[in-house]
Amino acid sequence: MAIKDLDLKLQPDSVSISNINFDQLNSHVVIAEDGVMNVASLVKSDEAEVAEPEVQESQKAETKPFPISIDTVSINDGAVTFIDNTMSPRFTTKLSHFKGAIKGLSSAELARADVDLNGRVDDVAQLSVTGKINPLKGDLYSDIKIRFEGYDMTAVTPYTGNFIGQAVDKGQLDLDLGYRVSERELIGENEISLDQFTLGRDIKSEDAVDLPVGLAIALLKDANGRIDLSLPVRGNLDEPEFKISKIVFKALFNVITGIVTSPFKLLSNLAGGDQELDKVAFVPGELNMVSGHQTRLESLAKALTQRPQLRIEVRGMFDQDRDVQALQQQKLATFFELSEQVTFADLKLSSIEAKLNKQLGKEALTSIKAENMVLPEGANEKAKPELDVEAYRFALYESLLKAQPVTDDELRELARSRASQIRNYLVETEGLSPERVFIMEAEADDSANEAGVLTVFQLSVD
C-alpha cells in the first residue's frame, strides 16, 4: 500500500490525501462453521481492546466530525478469496485481477465518491462495480450498480444442495444489481439471468425447502433455455436482523412460491392476457365448449410453446346433474325423432301416450292421467273431473325424460371425449408435441360452475 500527499492539520482538524494505492492486495474472507466471518471477528477484537475514556456530556456535544478527503483510492491487480465453511462441501470462490479506482471520497455534507472497479471471478466471470458512495459520513449513502457476467453455476452446488437438495449440473449466471441506500433505507433491484440452468443429482439436506423447484424452473425457462428474473428488495439498515442475503433469499423464495402455487397465472401473462387457463367449460351433454373458451386453448398453446419443458395434463369431467339431464333430453329427442322442425309440442298426444305405454307400461300411463284430472273452473265438487291437457302433456314429458337411462360409463365416455377433443386441438391445430399432452382419468365435476361442465388442466415437468 502506498499513500501519496498526506496532509494532516489540527485546529481546525482535517486530513487530506491525494492517493492511496493498493498494489497486488491479497485478502481472505472466511466464514467459519459457526457463521462468524473472520473480518467481523477482527472488528470485535479491536473494539474490545480499545477502552473509551469517560467524556462529559458537554464535551460530547462539542465534538465535531473529523474532516477527511481522499482524492483517489486505486487498486491494481488485487485478489480476494472467499470461503464459506457453513456449507458442506465448503464453498470457495476467488476474485482476481481486481482493479479500478474510487475518486472523491470526502466526509463533507452531500459528498459523493465515484466508484469504477472491475475484476474476474474464478478467472472466468467478469465483474464490474460502478456508482457513487459516501462511506465517510454518518448518514450512509450509496448508489451502486454491480454487473456480473458468465459465472459458472456448478460452483454454487454447495448452496443449491443445502437449500433445494440438488446439485447444479450446468448453467451460467448473469447479474445486474442496483442498490441504493439513503437515510438508512435500502432499495435494491436484482436482475437475474440464467442460461441453460439445469439441476443434477440429489443431495440430502435437512434445510432444503419443500417446493417443486423443477416445476418452477420449467415455468421460468424459455424456449432458448434462459431464465430471467426480477427481484426488487427493500429494507432498513437499522433493523436488528437486517441481512441483505436474507432479504434476497426471502424475495426469491416468495417469487418461486408464487409461481408454483399459481402456474397458470404466469402462463396467462406469457400469452398476453388474464384468462383462466387452468380450465375450460363445456355445454352440458355436449362436446362443444361454451362461448369464448376456445380462445383459452389458443392462449394456453401459445404459452406452452414458450415453455418447452412443461407438459399439460387434461382431465375431462362430467356433471352428474347437468350432463345427465342433457343426455336424457338428447335420448328423448332421438326416441321421438325430434328436430328443429318437429318439437315435443308438435307431437300428437296419442303418440306420446303410446311411447310412454311402451316404455313404462299401462299402469304408469293410467296413474299419470289420474294425477292430472281436475275439476272445471267454477264447477262444484260433484262435477265430473276433466283432463288438464297441458299439465298432462308436461307430466308425460317429465316421466319419459326421467326414464331415459344414462349410465356412469356414458358419463365417463363423454368426459374422455372432451379431453380427447382438447388434446387433438392442441396437437393437430396448435402444433404441440403429442408427448407433451396427456389425458387423465375422467372425474365428476362437483364445482357447479356457472359457465358449464369443466375440463381442468394440470402441469408437470418433462
Residue ranges: model-predicted function:
Residues M1-H97, Q196-G214, L237-N254:
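Secondary-structure transition motifs
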Residues V73, V115-L117, I312:
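Hydrophobic beta-strand residues in large extracellular and virion-surface proteins
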